[in-house]
Structure formats: C-alpha cells, structure tokens
Amino acid sequence: MIANLAKAANVNVQRILRVCIASNTTMNHLLLGVDSDPVRMEPYIPSFFSWDGLRGIDLRLPAHPDAPVILAPNIGSYVGGDITAGTFSSMIWNRDEMSLFIDLGTNGEIVYGNRDFLMSCACSAGPAFEGGDISCGMRATDGAI
C-alpha cells in the first residue's frame, strides 16, 4: 500500500521519513512476528502493549531504511492501536463534554468519556454484519449499515 500511494503521489519511497501504523492488537502481533496466542486465550493479555525503536528496515517497509515506525499502542487484548489512534485523533480525551467513539469492523470497540476519564470495551461485531448463525444480520456489503 505504501509503495502504491507513493507511486500515485509521484514520491520516491526513500523520501518517506516516518511511518505511523494503527492496527488492532492481533495485527500488531502479526506485523512484528510476535506470538498472538495470548490475545485469544485466557486471561487475554497481549504479549506487548507498545513497541519502541522500530525502523522501516526492521519491517522491510518501502520507506527510508532509518524511518522511525510509530506503532499505535494496544490498550488491551481487543482494544488495540486502531482504537487508540482513533481516540487520539478524535480528541475526545481533551473534551469537556462526554463523547463516544465507535470503531466497527470484525470486532467493535467503543470508547466513552472526556478529559476526566475514558473507558473502553470491545465486542464481536462481525456476526452482526455477516449473518453467522444469527437471525438478523447480513454480509458486510451495501446496505449493511
């Protein structure tokens, strides 16, 4: 994806000097080649929450070899870097009023709160869109939402 975007923008990948990645906890583990079994087995604790010191060359990314790679930190087993990045970019952590941030995909994550506190939770959302053994649901296609 990086190479395609750089090509479309007519940018030499060697000029990409920083890479930020926001993915769920399991994808973070797979990206770094870390065993992801702890995420899916009791007590559902990730092998890591954050990972510092990555460079483009470490992940064989099409970017400058020394480009720092910032991996959005995991909050928990099913609340990963994707929801961390969404919470940060939506600025709900800095608001006076109570706010709700929802990320729906195969898993659903919800963050609720304001500058005083934030709480999060996760749930399986895929079956609601895929119709897997439930009476009301459909595939993730036009009209699903």
Model feature map: region roles:
Residues 1-30, 38-40, 70:
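N-terminal glycine/serine-rich phosphate-binding loop of ATP-dependent small-molecule kinases
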Residues 1-11, 17, 66-67, 75-80, ...:
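Alpha/propeptide regions of enzymes that mature by internal proteolysis
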Residues 2-6, 20-22, 84-88, 108-111, ...:
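Short, well-ordered alpha-helical packing segments
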Residues 22, 80, 101-103:
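Alpha-helical architecture
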Residues 24-32, 103-110:
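Conserved phosphate/anionic-ligand binding catalytic regions in large, soluble enzymes, centered on
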Residues 31-85, 129-133:
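Glycine-rich phosphate-binding loop and adjoining helix at the ATP-binding site
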Residues 38-51, 85, 93-145:
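Glycine-rich phosphate-binding loop of actin/hexokinase-like ATP-binding domains
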